[in-house]
């Protein structure tokens, strides 16, 4: 039975003594760079813009972008074949990529781009190449299980969450049997099957964590909150919609063996130095974070953060 649990957190619960070391990521010549994933080998992925365009939502770009990966300091710019638009949203430890693309010959799709350079396109039943609903792959683990969501370009939240594996979709809508829930999204999947994401529940956008049949929902500082990456330790990352990033260690392990007792996770601030807003998106099993920050002038940049703990 799913359990619905909101943790209302005060800023004082942040563990400010445990910090990260940050590095900015900017693609030369780009007007904007966003990092969306990092794996245990340190491979960094994301997307960039070459023209000015204002986004509706930081999670899913409604402006044309090109993908990239950085391996051992070498930048490789990426476009799905025949595409005018390629979002690289996630990477696993083998270097397999997932994201969203619009192609000139077959329209809009989610995709899995294997490191052997084989690309698989897919769309949920609700979406399609010419639909206003778009299939956006957000994350992938080593077993090639993909987590994602359906999105409209104009919306501030996803429509429907899902996982995809071996050509088959499974709906992963937390709280689907509870009145008042909507706007689900699966934003992170770990190598051992933990899921992280978001939904709208009890008047708030809530971060969501799933381990087996257990589902937990979290708010940071009583504000709308998005859960993004998750690793095999059960660590999670995310942000409030005001741009306050956070990391929480091993939240299921903190509960002990009694699943009826919830323990409030201890949150660590994720804040790029002097940034107006910080958005952590991807998390590796080595607790490296890939994300995006907004500078004091409104410029958008990528970053990676390495834990000092």
Set out the residue ranges of the language-model regions.
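Sec-dependent signal peptide recognition
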Residues: 2-8
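N-terminal signal peptide c-region/cleavage motif recognized by signal peptidases
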Residues: 12-14
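Residue-level hotspots at or immediately adjacent to binding/recognition sites across diverse folds
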Residues: 17-309
């Amino acid at each position: 039975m799913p359990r619905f649990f909101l943790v209302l957190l005060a800023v004082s619960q942040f563990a400010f003594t445990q910090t990260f070391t940050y590095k900015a990521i900017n693609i030369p010549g780009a007007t904007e760079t966003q990092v969306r994933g990092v794996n245990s080998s340190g491979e960094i992925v994301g997307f960039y813009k070459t023209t000015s365009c204002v986004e509706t939502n930081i999670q899913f770009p409604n402006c044309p972008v090109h993908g990239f990966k950085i391996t051992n300091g070498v930048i490789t710019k990426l476009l799905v074949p025949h595409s005018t638009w390629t979002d690289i949203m996630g990477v696993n430890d083998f270097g397999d990529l997932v994201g969203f693309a619009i192609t000139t010959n077959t329209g809009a799709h989610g995709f899995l781009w294997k490191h052997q350079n084989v690309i698989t396109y897919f769309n949920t039943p609700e979406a399609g190449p010419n639909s206003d609903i778009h299939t956006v792959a957000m994350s992938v683990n080593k077993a090639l299980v993909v987590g994602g969501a359906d999105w409209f370009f104009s919306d501030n939240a996803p429509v429907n969450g899902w996982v995809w594996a071996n050509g088959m979709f499974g709906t992963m809508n937390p709280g689907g049997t509870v009145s008042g829930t909507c706007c689900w999204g699966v934003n992170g999947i770990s190598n051992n099957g933990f899921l992280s994401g978001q939904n709208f529940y009890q008047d708030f956008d809530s971060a969501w964590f799933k381990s087996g049949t257990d589902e937990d929902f979290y708010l940071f500082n009583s504000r709308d909150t998005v859960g993004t990456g998750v690793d095999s330790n059960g660590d999670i990352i995310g942000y409030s919609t005001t741009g306050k990033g956070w990391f929480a260690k091993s939240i299921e392990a903190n509960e002990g063996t009694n699943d009826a007792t919830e323990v409030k996770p201890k949150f660590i601030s994720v804040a790029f130095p002097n940034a107006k807003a910080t958005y952590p998106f991807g998390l590796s099993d080595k607790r490296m974070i890939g994300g995006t920050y907004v500078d004091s002038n409104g410029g958008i940049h990528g970053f990676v953060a390495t834990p000092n703990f």
